[in-house]
């Protein structure tokens, strides 16, 4: 049957409806319950290094991270947390801080009540919160401290530190089953059960769903998709997405984007982190940028103006369009922190920097402002289009500088004080 004979019920392209979850407030940030999908990140500083951690949280926040997780692994780190919070507040930064606890979180939160108060959310790993007869007691201790301080909790299972007693139990049951499942399927079930059983236990202690976020991270793309599909189908807790140990560079970006993109398209996920291994001395804010670009590319949110640029081919032997596209993109990234306040709505701007006559004029017309640079053998002229209309033709060695000035002028007139109100639909 021809596809046109059986059209889709909805002609509007887009993701599936968001999975209905219970909204959780983390500081002043809403997670789940239909709220915009939240971008978060994690520091890699020694939390006991107060100034270093303040500086990195500030950079992550400025880059667009809406929540930042910090490691709280020992006494010195726990003692530093309130000073970190206070130092950030002095800079005007109110980004919620999440404490990442393993093994001794119950003790650190009890011994350092100022730490418990300063954090906005506690992350509990059900695989190492305690072992054997201590597990329930230590888990209960953290939940009760969260209740006392009115804090949110993320119950985050991870298959690198999965609850071994639960996994062994499920493996033993599977071994004697008449229809045994694949070992990886049993491991995925253990991940989901670990999160859900812990959440049920937290509710028994008194922690409401409005204070709980769940995650179940693995490092395999296909397993991650299956785990979160299962988790979402069996609960309405707010969900944090992330591919653990995604890796470095393009590999980590591609793997995380593939996994999270599929889940987001299916309506699953209330907050995300792109867990990238930074290059030595690399910029930690890259994971924030990638998370934002994923959400913006898929149409969930807008963070910064988009710069469209053609990939280049034999018609574009000049590097001018590439250099201009990079220059405009970098310029926008640098200016966005100030622009957010000065030019409300500027994040919806679309800029096109094209390299030849084939797609250049058409793509430039689709953008708010676009330029079509000449390709090899073409007339050395670059038409500029504003809101679909050709307004000027640039020539000579100052094309790049002139176009950047036109972009700035467009922003000032479109989004500056006194400009008409701009909506995302525009």
From Swiss-Prot:
InterPro entries: Dihydropteroate_synth-like_sf (IPR011005), IspG_bac (IPR016425), IspG_bac-typ (IPR004588), NO2/SO3_Rdtase_4Fe4S_sf (IPR045854). GO terms for biological process: isopentenyl diphosphate biosynthetic process, methylerythritol 4-phosphate pathway; terpenoid biosynthetic process. PANTHER family: 4-HYDROXY-3-METHYLBUT-2-EN-1-YL DIPHOSPHATE SYNTHASE (PTHR30454), 4-HYDROXY-3-METHYLBUT-2-EN-1-YL DIPHOSPHATE SYNTHASE (FERREDOXIN), CHLOROPLASTIC (PTHR30454:SF0). Binds 1 [4Fe-4S] cluster. This is 4-hydroxy-3-methylbut-2-en-1-yl diphosphate synthase (flavodoxin). It catalyses: (2E)-4-hydroxy-3-methylbut-2-enyl diphosphate + oxidized [flavodoxin] + H2O + 2 H(+) = 2-C-methyl-D-erythritol 2,4-cyclic diphosphate + reduced [flavodoxin]. It comes from the Bacteria. [4Fe-4S] cluster binds at residues 310, 313, 356, 363. It comes from Rhodopseudomonas palustris (strain BisA53). Converts 2C-methyl-D-erythritol 2,4-cyclodiphosphate (ME-2,4cPP) into 1-hydroxy-2-methyl-2-(E)-butenyl 4-diphosphate. Pathway: Isoprenoid biosynthesis; isopentenyl diphosphate biosynthesis via DXP pathway; isopentenyl diphosphate from 1-deoxy-D-xylulose 5-phosphate: step 5/6. Pfam families: GcpE. Keywords: 4Fe-4S, Iron, Iron-sulfur, Isoprene biosynthesis, Metal-binding, Oxidoreductase. The gene is ispG. It is an enzyme of class 1 (oxidoreductase). GO terms for molecular function: 4 iron, 4 sulfur cluster binding; 4-hydroxy-3-methylbut-2-en-1-yl diphosphate synthase activity (ferredoxin); 4-hydroxy-3-methylbut-2-enyl-diphosphate synthase activity (flavodoxin); iron ion binding. Its EC number is 1.17.7.3. Its cofactor is [4Fe-4S] cluster. Belongs to the IspG family.
